[in-house]
């Protein structure tokens, strides 16, 4: 026997779309952390890391010097995972606040020109870094460890 359901009983209600137990948002002026994940073509992990350290890390360090970045950490997994969950490098940046994290740095282009006067080589190496990159994603994170 076929049951006929009304649209109202099977439709998703707006209240059901709200996040269940969503974490609180970071307060205004509070530090804000983002994890940046990089998945590289097999066999090119070392090349990617060398290019990242040569052409991207120095600008992050310059930005840290301005106070926009409070902490910077680069990690790689100690063990292998499944291919669909694999990532090769995670860069965690703790920004001064969420506004700094989500707006363009007005000094970044000047830093790049200062650090790499040969812009043609810089552009070529950055292009190569992205050619060997399979995936990249950003994950804002919040610490929720209870206080003592």
Which ranges hold each PLM region?
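A cross-kingdom feature marking solvent-exposed beta-strand/loop segments within repeated
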Residues: 77-79
């Amino acid at each position: 026997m076929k049951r006929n359901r009304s649209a109202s009983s099977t439709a998703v209600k707006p209240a059901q779309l709200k996040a269940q137990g969503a974490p609180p948002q970071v307060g205004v002026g509070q530090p804000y952390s983002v994890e940046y994940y990089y998945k590289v073509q097999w066999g090119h992990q070392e090349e990617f890391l060398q290019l990242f350290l040569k052409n991207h890390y120095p600008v992050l360090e310059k930005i840290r010097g301005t106070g926009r970045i409070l902490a910077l950490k680069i990690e790689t997994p100690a063990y292998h995972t499944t291919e669909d969950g694999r990532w090769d490098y995670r860069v965690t940046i703790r920004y001064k606040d969420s506004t700094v994290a989500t707006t363009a740095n007005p000094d970044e282009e000047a830093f790049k020109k200062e650090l790499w006067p040969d812009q043609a080589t810089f552009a070529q190496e950055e292009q190569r870094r992205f050619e060997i990159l399979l995936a990249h994603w950003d994950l804002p994170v919040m610490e929720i460890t209870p206080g003592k």
